[in-house]
Each structure stands twice: as C-alpha cells, then as structure tokens.
Swiss-Prot record:
Belongs to the UPF0398 family. HAMAP family: UPF0398. This is UPF0398 protein LEUM_0652. It holds the Pfam family YpsA. InterPro entries: YspA.
Length: 188
C-alpha cells in the first residue's frame, strides 16, 4: 500500500523552532498512525516537503525504518527549485530530508510558473497512492483544504481511503504521550 501524507504547515499550527513541544506530540501522532498503517500493509509513504506535517513525516519515517526496514519513503516536489525562496537554514534542512528518502523527484520539470503545477501535483499524488493520511481538521482550515477538497471529490468516483487526524485526536495523542512520559514508557 502507498500512502499520501500531508497536513498543516508549521506556521498554521503555531510551532516555533524544532524544539516546540507541539512538534513532539505531532511526531508521536504520526508515528502511532503510521505504525498502524504499516501493520495493515503500508509499504510506501509518499509526501511532499512543505514545512510542517510533511517534513515531520519525513523525519518520523526515516526513524521508523530502523524498526521497519521494509518501509519506503518518497518525497515528491510539485516543481523544480521547490523551497528556493526559503531561508538558507530551511533550504539546507530540505536537502538533508530529501537525502533520507528512498526516492525523490519533482512532478513538474520546470520552476514554479502557475497554480496548474500544484493541481498536477495533486493528480500525481492521487494516481500514485492507494489512500491518504491527512493531519487536518475542517474546523481549523489551512492550506491543506485544497488537497482535502481534491481527495473528497476523487472519493466520489474512486474508492480511496482517507484517514484524518483532527485537533480532537491530536489532543488525545497529547494526553496519551503525557501519560507515557509520566510512567517512563515513552517509546518514541
């Protein structure tokens, strides 16, 4: 099974820096959710490289590969020179994350020219995955709304499972993580 993973950007979640405690909860939720998917036949995680859920997904999957060496990671970029407007630190981090993947390529062979490249990226992701995992809550809109709308429209024509982790579930994961940390049972 191939899974498209995306979700909120870091600024949409109000995270600041790599040490923000919210990131620990999100990575824990990613790990738990992806572990469940691996147990159900997940072979490939296919994600983008946006700052936020997508980059944290890359980090989590790279770490999970120690316990699940069969798990593969593809980082797909919507266009060439993706991230070139970012700060030098974020560009360096992007290159480091891409290096951790089993496969990475740009869907469009040209630098950003128009929003059609983003639509083509969405079509590519749908065509090359068997389902999706979105860290997204319809009550707290963000840029993922565009991917969410494409997936829900696609679902009207094609069986395509979508697992959504919403704010309520993130709070549940936060409580679970806190409990494990208090009992020194934190395993991620």
């Amino acid at each position: 099974m191939r899974l498209w993973v995306t979700g909120y950007r870091s600024y949409e979640l109000g995270t600041f820096g790599d040490k923000d405690p919210k990131i620990k909860v999100i990575k824990y939720a990613l790990h738990q959710t992806l572990k469940e998917q691996v147990d159900n036949g997940l072979e490939w995680v296919i994600t983008g490289a946006q700052l936020g859920i997508e980059q944290w997904t890359i980090e989590v999957v790279a770490d999970m590969k120690k316990d699940y060496p069969q798990l593969k990671l593809a980082v797909m970029l919507p266009f060439k020179q993706f991230g070139s407007q970012w700060s030098e630190d974020n560009q360096a981090k992007l290159q480091k994350l891409i290096a951790q993947s089993d496969f990475s390529e740009s869907v469009s062979t040209k630098p950003f020219q128009s929003p059609i490249q983003l639509k083509n990226y969405q079509k590519f992701m749908l065509a090359h995955t068997d389902g999706a995992l979105f860290f997204y809550d319809t009550e707290f809109e963000g840029k993922t709304i565009f991917d969410f709308q494409v997936v829900t429209k696609y679902q009207t024509q094609t069986p395509y499972p979508l697992v959504q982790v919403d704010m309520y579930q993130l709070q549940e994961y936060a409580s679970e993580l806190e409990e494990k940390m208090n009992e020194n049972r934190y395993d991620y």
